[in-house]
Amino acid sequence: MNKVFGIVGWSGSGKTDLTTRIISYYSQKKIIVSSIKHTHHDFEIDKEGKDSQKHVRSGANEVILYNEKKWALISKLQQKSTSIYKILEKFEKKNQLILIEGLKHSKFPKLEVIRSSIKKPYIYKNDANIKAIVIDQEISDIKLSKLPIFKFSETENIGNFILEYFKR
């Protein structure tokens, strides 16, 4: 299986901003990286009136949007829920790393993004799979953690930490 690392935190913590900056950093280093964005909400990747949406609405169980440069699969063939492991099987083996944004209760190694203005429980305190913490500013009780702590702006250091994690 591909190397998988998660980026978790509460809504509004800055997960997407951090994830996209890490992806950009890896892309500049010619590291083949892909990502999964987990959401709790229903979503549509089609727009109203587009042909692919008409295929889905007419009853197609799976629709692939395709051109010579990219493709996307819309599938309604899942059981009650689709396991993240089934989704990971869809990725090409040539990926060197897959980042998962969200999915905070997964068993993958991950880091927690903490924004000081969000008053929610820290995930790392009850999750041994959290391997590092990313903060927007100094937070006194987080200093007591034995985990590595990065500032939100330290994209390169965070990216390198993730890469080094898999060399252990």
Model-predicted regions and their roles:
Residues I7:
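Hydrophobic anchor at the beta1->P-loop junction of P-loop NTPases
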Residues S75-H105:
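Phosphate-binding/switch loop-helix module in NTP-utilizing enzymes
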Residues L97-K151, T155-F166:
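Phosphate/Mg2+-binding loops and adjacent switch elements
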